[in-house]
Amino acid sequence: GCGPVIGIAGSEKKCQMIGELGADAMINYREENVAERVTELLPDGIDVYFDNVGGAILEAALDNLARDARVVLCGSISEYQQEHRTGPKNYTSLRASEADMRGFFVYNHAADFERAEVDMAGWIKAEKLRALVDISDGFESMPDALIGLYTGENLGKRLVRVMPGEDVIF
């Protein structure tokens, strides 16, 4: 296994949820200095960082990489609404730590979806994986559900059940 696993979220409720999912420690980026807290929790640096946020959180991670670390870029929600996207200002931290940074786009792995679905269903059944979903009901809830992703209102995967009572979810 790996460890310790550190979760970063923007509310106490989300940090509590991360702890319940098994993280060893949580950082509330709205209340704490992320870079300082990462240094405290991981004095030898980050070995693997999976980024969905970008911006200042990614920069804090890049400043705290262990030698030969791996950084995976999956999303950058902090940048999606920005007119001018800047990317990490401190990307040269990768050179000093001899780290690797690469992108991950789930749809490039479509050939693996069926196998992944079977594997993950097994993990859920064996209680090795918990799927957290935040479901809004009704087609008319779609705009608010989308906006909620950008404002941090969701707890888990945000889905919309188009027809309440049905299993058709987007």
Question: What do the predicted segments below correspond to?
Answer:
Residues 25-30, 134-141:
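Short acidic-hydrophobic, aromatic-tinged amphipathic segments that line or gate anion-handling sites
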Residues 18, 56-129, 163-170:
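Glycine-rich phosphate-binding loop and adjacent beta-alpha segment
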Residues 50, 62, 121, 143-146:
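Non-transmembrane alpha-helical segments in soluble domains
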Residues 1-60, 83, 107:
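Adenosine-nucleotide cofactor-binding segment
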Residues 114, 140-143:
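Residues in well-ordered alpha-helical elements
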Residues 2-3, 45, 125-132:
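A local structural motif
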Residues 128-135, 143-170:
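C-terminal capping/lid region of NAD(P)-dependent oxidoreductase domains
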Residues 26, 101-103, 157-159:
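Conserved beta-strand scaffold positions in the cores of enzyme catalytic domains, especially
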